[in-house]
């Protein structure tokens, strides 16, 4: 039985020349695999069946793959003469239907039709077993490059390779510095900049060139995670993310940076990392002119202009600019720490925290400050440190105008305005602005006091307390008041200086009385509840 208004295979297939394929990042190749797997599933669901393909192997020769898949689709139908049409999938015909006015070519063997002689001839050879003179001379690859002697099955593959061989990349992106060897490559790439792809996400409006990529993306919003790790049970939205995660268990890394020795799972990751050494930032924001190392970074940055935060926590309603931040935030509710240090067993919420921690064991600090020579474990730490020399504070609070060196400091400060306390004690329900405060508070329940004074043996719940205490033995008072010269052991000087400035930032919500310290305000507020 034939399906009415069924799509042609080319409408759902994704194709690249072998040379375009060679230029793709592993992450882009992984996307291809995802798309083809989804295509197989979708076509199977409408009655088309064939043997399960090993896409991992077959995507190495995608163009020949599509011919095989067409044949398998034909074989799966009841009649051998299925009426399936064959379009030659040229570079700029990807994901498009056959253009009107093109004369079809009919196979004399089985009666099937195709729009191009190349696709028809390929099909006839499949029917008759006929091999052309070029085929007999060079085997399956009749087109041979004079420079490198590499041979190709298809003319367009040969032509694309010829450009790659001569380093010719005539197509460049106006939005960024990327260059491409074919018109189709730049068209697909421009969708990322323009956001005008034909398939849009129902939830956030993000545009995609292919339907299947859009469907995979929507899983971020729906929470569907069909791919599960057998070792730890963690689930993922995409099949390609799973093997990357599995490397956290095996410790396998594919590439190592020659500059600093850091290891990476994919060549695309190491290419991006190398820019931290060279200083190359090919992606520029049109609104503010700021430049970035990676495309994902500029996409994330653009949301600071639009204020867009499409990823919302179902538990507390907090919104985020990217899915990974929501995922990381979710672990503050669950307490999950899936990434464990092999040397000391300490667990972390995300891989970046683990990687940062692991460097404390090696003491490797490849990034040196040019002004003072201080070494750092990663480029981002060096960048933040350099602000101590320049005095730069790029992160400003929209509520009060206060500026900060670090974005994380701004985020924490904003909680003083919103009153948000996302970290709650499971034992008594008390909530805290900072996770570190919760961690210290939990020791009041457990009785754990890991910091002991070497002079008198007194123990403390947090490191700052023991630092202040030790100064009672040494007599050190590093904090001096600018107004009266009085010195202090701790940063209590902040409260003291308010006695000179008259600043009282903590106000009672009931009567409006203001206080220098938050603890004084809280104590006062209790007088209202007692008087009731």
UniProtKB/Swiss-Prot annotation:
The gene is ZNF20. InterPro entries: KRAB, KRAB_dom_sf, Znf_C2H2-type, Znf_C2H2_sf, Znf_C2H2_type. Residues 7-78 form the KRAB domain. Belongs to the krueppel C2H2-type zinc-finger protein family. The keyword Disulfide bond does not apply. Keywords: DNA-binding, Metal-binding, Nucleus, Repeat, Transcription, Transcription regulation, Zinc, Zinc-finger. May be involved in transcriptional regulation. GO terms for biological process: regulation of transcription by RNA polymerase II. One of its GO terms (cellular component) is nucleus. It holds the Pfam family zf-C2H2. This is Zinc finger protein 20. Gene3D superfamilies: 6.10.140.140, Classic Zinc Finger. One of its GO terms (molecular function) is DNA-binding transcription factor activity, RNA polymerase II-specific. The keyword Nucleus applies. It is found in: Nucleus. It comes from the Eukaryota. A zinc finger (C2H2-type) spans 103-130, 143-165, 171-193, 199-221, 227-249, 255-277, 283-305, 311-333, 339-361, 367-389, 395-417, 423-445, 451-473, 479-500, 506-528.
């Amino acid at each position: 039985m034939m399906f009415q208004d069924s799509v042609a295979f080319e409408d759902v297939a994704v194709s690249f020349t072998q040379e375009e394929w060679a230029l793709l990042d592993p992450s882009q190749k992984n996307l291809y695999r995802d798309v083809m797997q989804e295509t197989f599933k979708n076509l199977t669901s409408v009655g088309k069946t064939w043997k399960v393909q090993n896409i991992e192997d077959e995507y190495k020769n995608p163009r020949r793959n599509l011919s095989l898949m067409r044949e398998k689709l034909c074989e799966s139908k009841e009649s051998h003469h299925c009426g399936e049409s064959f379009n030659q999938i040229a570079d700029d015909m990807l994901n498009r239907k056959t253009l009107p006015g093109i004369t079809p070519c009919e196979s004399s063997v089985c009666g099937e039709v195709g729009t191009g002689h190349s696709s028809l001839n390929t099909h006839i050879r499949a029917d008759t077993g006929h091999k052309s003179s070029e085929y007999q001379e060079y085997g399956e690859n009749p087109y041979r490059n004079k420079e490198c002697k590499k041979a190709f099955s298809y003319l367009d593959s040969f032509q694309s390779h010829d450009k790659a061989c001569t380093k010719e990349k005539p197509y460049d992106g106006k939005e960024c510095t990327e260059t491409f060897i074919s018109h189709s490559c730049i068209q697909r790439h421009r969708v990322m900049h323009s956001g005008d792809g034909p398939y849009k996400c129902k939830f956030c409006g993000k545009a995609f060139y292919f339907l299947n990529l859009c469907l995979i993306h929507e899983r971020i919003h729906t929470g569907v995670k069909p791919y599960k790790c057998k070792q730890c049970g963690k689930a993922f939205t995409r099949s390609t993310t799973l093997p990357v995660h599995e490397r956290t268990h095996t410790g396998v890394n594919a590439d190592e940076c020659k500059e600093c020795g850091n290891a990476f799972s994919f060549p695309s990751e190491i290419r991006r990392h190398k820019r931290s050494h060279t200083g190359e930032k090919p992606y520029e924001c049109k609104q503010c002119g700021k430049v970035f190392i990676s495309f994902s970074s500029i996409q994330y940055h653009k949301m600071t202009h639009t204020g867009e935060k499409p990823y919302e926590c179902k538990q507390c309603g907090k919104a985020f600019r990217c899915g990974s931040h929501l995922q990381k935030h979710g672990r503050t509710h669950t307490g999950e720490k899936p990434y464990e240090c092999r040397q000391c067993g300490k667990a972390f919420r995300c891989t970046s925290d683990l990687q940062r921690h692991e460097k404390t064991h090696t003491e490797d600090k490849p990034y040196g400050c040019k002004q003072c020579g201080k070494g750092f474990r990663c480029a981002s730490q060096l960048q933040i440190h350099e602000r101590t020399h320049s005095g730069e504070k790029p992160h400003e609070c929209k509520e009060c105008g206060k500026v900060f060196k670090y974005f994380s400091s701004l985020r924490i400060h904003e909680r003083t305005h919103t009153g948000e306390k996302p970290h709650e004690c499971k034992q008594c329900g008390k909530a805290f602005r900072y996770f570190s405060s919760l961690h210290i508070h939990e020791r009041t329940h457990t009785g754990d006091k890991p910091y002991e004074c070497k002079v008198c043996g007194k123990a403390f719940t947090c490191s700052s307390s023991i630092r202040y205490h030790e100064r009672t033995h040494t007599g050190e008072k590093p904090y001096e008041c600018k107004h009266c010269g009085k010195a202090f052991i701790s940063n209590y000087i902040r409260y003291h200086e308010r006695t000179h400035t008259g600043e009282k930032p903590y106000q009672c919500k009931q009567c409006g009385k203001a206080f220098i310290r938050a603890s004084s305000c809280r104590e006062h507020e209790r007088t209202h509840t007692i008087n009731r």
